[in-house]
């Protein structure tokens, strides 16, 4: 058989069919479809056609550009099978789709082809597979039989995928041009190969430590529930249950508002009953509410995270155990678009590392010791200092704050605002206005009602009819409104920035981050969030730029070291203990802090290397 000269084409589409999804375990590719710009497609069963396998092994990595939907999966699966693609030359239509519109409900190839190109994949194949193997004619049931199907049937299915991905990529080229998304797309494209490498190499774990930590969580959970029962005077099931309603005994006041026993107003469910969900519990001052939330968090950490995500996905490689997290650059194709973020932040699944709270020292101290650097190396940890608040200051451009940072780049944003407004930096008691909480409200567009709730100040709940549904909204009392107006008066530029962003969002339908990412407001909804989403989106963009700079420095200057992970505003690296680690950490610090395009300085410090993730977060700083 004659194989195509793929080096002559500016781009091709490649898609593999596999025995399953777990490339990091035993699943492998069994077939590959290649689509050319000429419109020709060919499917190769590489189990039977070993000439095709060896040709791909020798030639696919030479392709100028390879495009596909969720091509990261193909890279991993083909590599596990013995065929290497060059991630630097690969482009993912799923990542591009989320840049073009971050609000879609689905990002799978079939949904995008129907939406943009009026094309449809061959879903009849599931009926054909059901006729051969039995069972329901659905993708979920039949996709597991694909590797057993006749070659011509698989070829029909696979070739439609590569053709569809190629044509979607072509359409996206024009749309990226039309929307002027080149800058942010180049950032995502540059980042892609580093994400692939971080996933491929994974993170080393200690399974024995994981089991010990799960047992410790059993003990702490039991103590928490015992204290809850003591305060309640009866046994309370911390999961949603009738005992929680009995505990908080909600009643309607004269205005018809449901209130808990501590006086906290409660929103209503669709049926008009009082809602005692997590948000209601977070609003309460009742200590039992905090114990319920703590017990739930401990159970989730133990059962879902440690036993499910970590131990459930750990694999042994030689004498070590690893997890290989799935890192979502934007939105995923899982069907509901729930993985990844519209503002550009990374998210992790399998395990969901971002769910380990960075500020909850109790949970962090239990979970983070499970994660280890590469064998023979140590773990160093860097955390950006008030990153989103500094970006908030850059955009709002308040004269006093800009001048304060110019005099001392290490100043605390919350203390600066406290000095300007006369409020304490942090709350010293419930119901006390404080600079930190108001800054959080401004960055995350809480609204005055939610801000009042967070600070423990008076608020009411009003039902608002949106036409298709009725929604309960928190309405701040006069005390909170006065505090917010005082904030606007003393921290000048914030109110004007919010007004300007909202106006642009309403008139244009989107706002742009520093790197050109579009944050859209379909039908003009939620434009009051525009300024905060600019801050968060810009932070996400700069975070991705930092990942690229850190990974490329380590790759160039000390390739035996590597970037392990990035969650929240943290960067973790694995380093040789060779006497040069402090030099490398200071270089990384300089790369992250060099942001001349911002009006305010960016600050990060890296820890002295330590044996595990938790100890690195507790170690002295190496870059001060």
From Swiss-Prot:
UniProt key word Transmembrane: no
Keywords noted in UniProt: DNA replication, DNA-directed DNA polymerase, Nucleotidyltransferase, Transferase, Viral DNA replication
Protein name stated in the entry: DNA polymerase DpoZ
Gene3D superfamilies named in the record: 3.30.70.370, 5' to 3' exonuclease, C-terminal subdomain (1.10.150.20), Ribonuclease H-like superfamily/Ribonuclease H (3.30.420.10), Taq DNA Polymerase, Chain T, domain 4 (1.20.1060.10)
GO BP annotations, alphabetical order: DNA-templated DNA replication; double-strand break repair; viral DNA genome replication
SUPFAM superfamilies attached to this UniProt entry: DNA/RNA polymerases, Ribonuclease H-like
Family according to the record: Belongs to the DNA polymerase type-A family. DpoZ subfamily.
General function of this protein: DNA polymerase that preferentially incorporates the non-canonical base aminoadenine/dZTP instead of adenine into the synthesized DNA. 29 times as efficient in using dZTP instead of dATP as a substrate. In addition to this preference for dZTP, the phage also encodes a dATP triphosphohydrolase that removes dATP and its precursor dADP from the nucleotide pool of the host.
One Pfam entry name: DNA_pol_A_exo1
Recorded superkingdom: Viruses
Catalyzed reaction equations: DNA(n) + a 2'-deoxyribonucleoside 5'-triphosphate = DNA(n+1) + diphosphate; dZTP + DNA(n) = DNA(n)-Z + diphosphate
Name of the gene: dpoZ
Molecular function in Gene Ontology: 3'-5' exonuclease activity; DNA binding; DNA-directed DNA polymerase activity
């Amino acid at each position: 058989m004659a194989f195509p000269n793929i080096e002559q084409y500016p781009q091709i589409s490649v898609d593999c069919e596999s025995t399953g999804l777990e490339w990091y375990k035993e699943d492998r590719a069994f077939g590959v479809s290649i689509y050319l710009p000429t419109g020709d497609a060919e499917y190769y069963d590489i189990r039977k056609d070993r000439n095709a396998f060896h040709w791909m092994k020798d030639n696919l990595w030479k392709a100028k550009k390879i495009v596909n939907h969720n091509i990261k999966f193909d890279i991993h699966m083909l590599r596990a099978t013995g065929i290497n693609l060059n991630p630097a030359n690969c482009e993912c239509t799923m990542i591009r789709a989320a840049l073009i519109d971050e609000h879609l409900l689905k990002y799978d190839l079939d949904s995008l082809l129907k939406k943009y190109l009026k094309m449809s994949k061959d879903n009849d194949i599931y009926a054909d597979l059901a006729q051969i193997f039995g069972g329901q004619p659905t993708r979920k049931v039949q996709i597991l039989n694909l590797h057993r199907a006749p070659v011509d049937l698989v070829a029909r299915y696979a070739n439609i995928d590569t053709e569809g991905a190629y044509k979607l990529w072509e359409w996206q080229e024009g749309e990226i041009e039309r929307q002027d998304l080149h800058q942010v797309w180049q950032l995502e494209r540059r980042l892609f190969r580093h994400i692939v490498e971080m996933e491929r190499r994974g993170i080393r774990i200690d399974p024995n430590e994981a089991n010990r930590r799960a047992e410790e969580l059993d003990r702490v959970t039991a103590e928490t529930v015992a204290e809850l029962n003591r305060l309640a005077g009866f046994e309370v099931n911390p999961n949603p249950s009738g005992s929680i309603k009995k505990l908080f005994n909600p009643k309607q006041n004269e205005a018809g508002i449901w209130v808990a026993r501590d006086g906290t107003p409660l929103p209503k469910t669709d049926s008009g009953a009082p809602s005692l969900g997590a948000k209601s519990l977070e609003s309460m001052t009742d200590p039992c509410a905090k114990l319920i939330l703590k017990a739930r968090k401990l159970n989730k950490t133990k059962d879902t995270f440690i036993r499910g995500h970590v131990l459930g996905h750990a694999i042994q490689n030689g004498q070590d155990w690893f997890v290989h997290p799935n890192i979502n650059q934007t939105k995923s194709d899982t069907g509901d678009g729930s993985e990844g973020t519209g503002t550009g932040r990374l998210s992790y699944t399998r395990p969901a590392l971002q769910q380990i709270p960075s500020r909850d020292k109790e949970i962090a101290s239990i979970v983070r010791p499970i994660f280890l650097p590469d064998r023979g190396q140590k773990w160093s940890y860097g955390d950006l200092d008030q990153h989103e608040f500094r970006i908030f200051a850059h955009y709002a451009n308040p004269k006093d704050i800009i001048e304060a940072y110019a005099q001392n780049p290490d100043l605390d944003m919350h203390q600066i605002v406290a000095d300007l407004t006369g409020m304490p930096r942090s709350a010293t008691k419930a119901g006390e206005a404080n600079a930190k909480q108001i800054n959080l409200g401004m960055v995350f567009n809480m609204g005055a009602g939610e801000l009042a709730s967070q600070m423990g100040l008076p608020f009411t709940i009003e039902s608002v009819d949106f036409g298709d549904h009725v929604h309960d909204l928190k309405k701040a009392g006069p005390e909170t409104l006065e505090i917010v107006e005082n904030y606007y008066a003393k921290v000048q530029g914030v109110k004007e920035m919010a007004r300007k962003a909202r106006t642009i969002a309403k008139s244009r339908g989107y706002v742009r981050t520093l790197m050109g990412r579009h944050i859209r407001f379909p039908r003009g909804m939620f434009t009051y969030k525009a300024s905060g989403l600019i801050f968060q989106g810009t932070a996400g963009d700069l975070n991705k730029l930092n990942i690229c700079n850190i990974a490329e420095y380590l790759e160039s200057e000390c390739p035996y070291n590597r970037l392990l992970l990035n969650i929240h505003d943290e960067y973790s690296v694995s380093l040789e203990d060779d006497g040069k680690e402090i030099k490398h950490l200071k270089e990384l610090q300089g790369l992250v802090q060099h942001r001349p395009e911002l009006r305010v300085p960016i600050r990060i410090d890296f820890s002295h290397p330590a044996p595990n993730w938790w100890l690195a977060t507790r170690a002295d700083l190496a870059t001060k």
